[in-house]
């Protein structure tokens, strides 16, 4: 799938990977880019830079998701591609985190994709074509030494993308799942950030967007901007006990470095 001449919606488009996606899609010749984010001020700036349109969107609110999709369909007549990219990092402890925080992270990292698909898939199916990309994380494939709510919900996002691909491929919808490792965004920047250990192998948001465009053109399901993640998947599958042992050691090192 080529982005040229496509009507595109990017959630979480105000910053980081989402912003880079909008800019790259514009460079690829997208017909119109809709930039949706709860950070409306920055969404407007991105939209202006790509000659697009901004929406204030709380992806955890299904009615808000439906309204945005309906407005785009009313204005543009179709949506060719949705980058369901909005997400949130998670608090560290699996048991210390409140039920309310667990629920909020789940709504943003998993249910938001359901809300957008529920609103947009009927029109895509009617048009006989469409594409939908869920942004998960390498943590959704490999796990992570900290931040259990993030890990659990990103695993859920991968499983949801797989389910969508199985269910809707035959109706003309190409589904993909973006699973980057370290990307130089606010999720890992800063020495006190518990994800700062990812910095040595981190790529720029622009490099991540480049990988997305390349993968979309090949219509692959799993988009891995970090090639080594594919090797890690194999290692985890070959010996899960050894993999968990390595993550326990990594967790201890991370917590020790933070004096936790």
Each language-model region and where it sits:
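Conserved glycine-rich cofactor-binding loop
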Residues: 14-15
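Active-site-adjacent segment of SDR/Rossmann-fold oxidoreductases
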Residues: 28, 142, 163-173
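The beta1-alpha1 cofactor-binding region of Rossmann-like NAD(H)/NADP(H)-dependent oxidoreductases
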Residues: 40-41, 57-67, 99
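Substrate-binding pocket helix/loop in short-chain dehydrogenase/reductase
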Residues: 93-94, 98-103
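Active-site helix of classical SDR
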Residues: 117, 153
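Residue(s) in the substrate-gating loop at a strand-loop-helix junction
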Residues: 137
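C-terminal helical subdomain
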Residues: 177, 193-232
